[in-house]
């Protein structure tokens, strides 16, 4: 198989000093999004999956993503085709990672699956290569146990769509080196991402823990017939969702309380009453799940548009929002 690698590289210090070659292991939704991002930034990419059918489907999605970026003026004219030429497909993990400087793993979130893949990547990738996982909730301390070079293993969890949303959560396991954490942080900045490095591991990291808390309350409101799924989404999008692209929960309470200290003094009691009435279940009750599914299926946008149409509309709105935020 012909090896053609880009001259574009990221230069930092130590591990990850010269990232030219990127491998994406797992070609599902997350893997194809990463491939879109890496190729759009000029890196040569090997996109790997055991299934040739998944690879072919993934490449169609990558092409669509790149054409969208070009149409949105986030890639120059002809940029989509140029980026596509930088991607090769491969069904074998060993062949995909054997020349890589940076590997982004995006296989299913299951410890057994991750460990099997990491063991092979660790054996076949060059010693200097960083092995990053897209896991949305697993702990790297557990995954890296099967590797002989655990210091280079790290979590780099994106938010979909990866090629548009800037955030990347970075977390190390007990044996991950500081050098690896800093190298991934700097590489993500070079890609135009906004990295946040966790001080320590926690299941679900930041975004998914916040989303899990919000989703449980949303499901409970629908289950108790307080409101429909459509109106929950409306309240979010036209309320906190509209306000919070600029501020997070802590800056919000600082503003709402006219100082965070005053917020703690004046609002603690009202929040205590709310928290007392909130659900604490850790798995969705079957009847609540049925109600949620039925209510979501009744939403106007779900009834009238396909998943692909909703995704395209979402991405178009994200581009507009990002342009406004970046203009400051």
Predicted segments with their positions:
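Active-site-proximal catalytic alpha-helix in oxidoreductases
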Residues: 33, 162-171, 190-191, 196-226, ...
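Rossmann-like NAD(P)-binding element
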Residues: 71-130
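NAD(P)-dependent Rossmann-like dehydrogenase/reductase catalytic/cofactor-binding core
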Residues: 2-10, 14-18, 41, 182, ...
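Rossmann-fold dinucleotide-binding core
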Residues: 133-200, 204-208
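Hydrophobic packing residues within well-ordered alpha-helices of enzyme cores
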Residues: 58, 121, 143-144
